[in-house]
């Protein structure tokens, strides 16, 4: 609740002079596919494996042809798919007999029956979205949450924000190794690239590079209450149609565990030496063993290749 109050406070402060940059969630995956087909037709590509995406990234994909007819038509295509609305209200009602055990990329986390109201605003530099949902939990009681509410600011080709975002990191449509919508999003801060970075010289071969980083606070009803969840992902597009992604997440800190820079450094670099996620001599992980088990983390790599066949988009991918 304290995160929600803080979010409302920020929105009230900036409502009168907001300019915004939109975040595109995994529920808009069908729209993104339309953009991907158009890009493949024009021999271009952009990162579509790290949701939420940014509209700035889509708009700037052909920015090196800013006065080219192809780029003008592409911008019109993006604007036609994602309506240029500065303010939007949305009400959704979902009715299910059971909680969905399997979800696709465009499914939101909900209980058996849910009702949600959403208001969003976007402009040039600052955007916000407020969403409140009521749903039936597993014991058939009505509960409320503010998932998918956030506020974000754009500058220096970066997006900074705070909120609870649905993330889908990976090339698939119905499952991922690490981050998907199978669990509710947790509140936290995040930063990600807006339209990607390109390097000259020796690093030019890696192509356009995008990154996303977040630090979230998890819930209290777990073995170690209220740990931090840190997630990072980098993607590279060395040439058109090929996307390579690297993902890493770690849980660190929590009740009765250290939360400082030393532990973070030990967790980040110690994993490379096999000093993380270890089991003690008694074949059990000691929750208080900060020195030998500073965090719980996993990593993944994925590769996606797209091509057109008779105006149909075909994708091959692998993740490990």
Regions found by a protein language model. Give the residues of each.
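Residues that define the transmembrane beta-barrel architecture of outer-membrane proteins
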Residues: 107-115, 142-147, 183-192, 226-230, ...
């Amino acid at each position: 609740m304290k995160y929600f109050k803080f979010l409302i406070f920020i929105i009230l402060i900036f409502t009168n002079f907001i300019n915004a940059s939109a975040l595109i969630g995994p529920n808009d995956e069908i729209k993104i596919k339309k953009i991907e087909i158009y890009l493949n037709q024009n021999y271009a590509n952009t990162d579509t494996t790290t949701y939420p995406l940014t509209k700035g990234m889509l708009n700037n994909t052909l920015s090196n042809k800013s006065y080219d007819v192809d780029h003008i038509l592409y911008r019109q295509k993006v604007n036609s798919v994602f309506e240029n609305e500065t303010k939007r209200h949305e009400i959704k009602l979902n009715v299910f007999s059971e909680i969905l055990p399997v979800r696709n990329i465009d499914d939101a986390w909900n209980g058996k029956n849910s009702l949600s109201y959403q208001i969003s605003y976007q402009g040039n530099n600052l955007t916000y979205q407020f969403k409140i949902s009521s749903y039936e939990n597993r014991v058939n009681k009505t509960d409320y949450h503010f998932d998918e509410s956030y506020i974000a600011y754009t500058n220096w080709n970066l997006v900074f924000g705070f909120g609870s975002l649905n993330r889908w990191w990976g090339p698939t449509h119905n499952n991922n190794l690490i981050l998907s919508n199978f669990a509710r999003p947790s509140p936290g801060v995040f930063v990600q690239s807006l339209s990607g970075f390109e390097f000259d010289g020796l690093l030019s071969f890696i192509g356009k590079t995008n990154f996303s980083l977040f630090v979230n606070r998890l819930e209290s009803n777990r073995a170690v209450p209220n740990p931090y969840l840190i997630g990072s992902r980098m993607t590279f597009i060395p040439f058109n149609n090929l996307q390579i992604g690297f993902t890493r997440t770690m849980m660190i800190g929590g009740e009765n565990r250290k939360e400082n820079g030393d532990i973070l450094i030990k967790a980040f670099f110690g994993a490379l030496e096999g000093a993380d996620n270890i089991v003690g001599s008694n074949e059990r992980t000691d929750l208080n063993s900060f020195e030998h088990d500073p965090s719980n983390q996993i990593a993944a790599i994925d590769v996606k290749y797209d091509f057109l066949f008779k105006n149909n988009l075909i994708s091959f991918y692998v993740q490990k």
